[in-house]
């Protein structure tokens, strides 16, 4: 498998969930992979699984300085960053009426500021070398509007859609392609914890939820990862500035 042969891929939020699946898929396609995360024991375990040449960088991506420094560490180790994936995210609940300034700021920091400054550093490296590069931002189908209890999350992720398109337009002449993926409801350990913590879900909730969906299942991290690898690779051609709904619901469709 060679879609990303010898490419240096940085996956922010790559130590677990969708990010970890993307890291595994990138390695399978021949990439040298670095992942960031806040929990060393999780990140180091994944890197051991990924094998020789993989790198874990401890970083709190809500801190702009750490987001930029993580890119710098990857450049120091590998000499460059060819591909960046922003997969870190915060999904804590809040409505328009009960969201505190602190919760709002936390969502903006993780879901928008972190990707902004990671892109700033990674794209600067790509441009300085005069080589093509790719960025994929993991966003959410909820950014189209979402549920009432996701107000700060939706605000931040909708901002990431705008940033994705703005940056893609700004750097298309540099041959840096920047795209986004609006993923739908996905079966991860984090989603299981969210359902239990915020919605009182019990054992068996996943099977019940899956049975009510058109495809009979929630989105799968490995499926998302394969799609991200395609977007990162030359196989996706010239596409840039696209924000793709990776979901089994159709925007505007009514039952």
Language-model regions: role of each:
Residues 145, 229, 240-255:
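Short C-terminal tail/terminal secondary-structure segment
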Residues 15-16, 39:
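Conserved glycine-rich cofactor-binding loop
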Residues 119, 156, 164:
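Active-site helix of classical SDR
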Residues 95-96, 103-108, 209:
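Substrate-binding pocket helix/loop in short-chain dehydrogenase/reductase
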Residues 124, 169-173, 237:
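Alpha-helical segment proximal to the catalytic Tyr-Lys
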Residues 85, 172, 177, 239-241:
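Short, small/polar-rich loop/turn modules that mediate ligand/substrate recognition or access, typified
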Residues 140:
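Residue(s) in the substrate-gating loop at a strand-loop-helix junction
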């Amino acid at each position: 498998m060679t879609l990303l042969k010898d490419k240096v891929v940085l996956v922010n939020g790559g130590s677990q969930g969708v990010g970890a699946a993307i890291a595994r898929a990138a390695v399978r396609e021949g990439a040298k992979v670095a992942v960031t995360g806040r929990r060393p024991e999780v990140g180091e375990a994944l890197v051991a699984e990924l094998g020789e040449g993989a790198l874990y960088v401890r970083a709190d991506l809500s801190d702009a300085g750490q987001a930029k420094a993580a890119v710098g560490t990857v450049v120091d180790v590998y000499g460059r960053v060819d591909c960046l994936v922003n997969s870190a995210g915060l999904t804590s609940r809040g409505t328009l009426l009960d969201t505190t300034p602190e919760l709002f700021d936390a969502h903006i920091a993780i879901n928008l500021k972190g990707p902004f400054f990671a892109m700033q550093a990674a794209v600067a490296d790509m441009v300085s070398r005069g080589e093509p590069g790719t960025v994929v931002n993991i966003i959410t189908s909820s950014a189209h509007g979402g549920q009432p209890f996701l107000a700060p999350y939706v605000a931040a992720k909708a901002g990431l859609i705008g940033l994705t398109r703005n940056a893609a337009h700004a750097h298309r002449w540099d041959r840096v392609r920047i795209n986004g993926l609006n993923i739908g409801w996905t079966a991860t350990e984090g989603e299981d914890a969210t359902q239990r913590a915020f919605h009182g879900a019990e054992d068996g909730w996943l099977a019940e939820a899956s049975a009510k969906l058109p495809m009979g299942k929630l989105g799968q991290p490995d499926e998302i990862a394969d799609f991200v690898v395609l977007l990162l690779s030359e196989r996706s051609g010239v596409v840039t500035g696209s924000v793709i709904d990776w979901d089994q619901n159709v925007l505007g469709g009514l039952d």
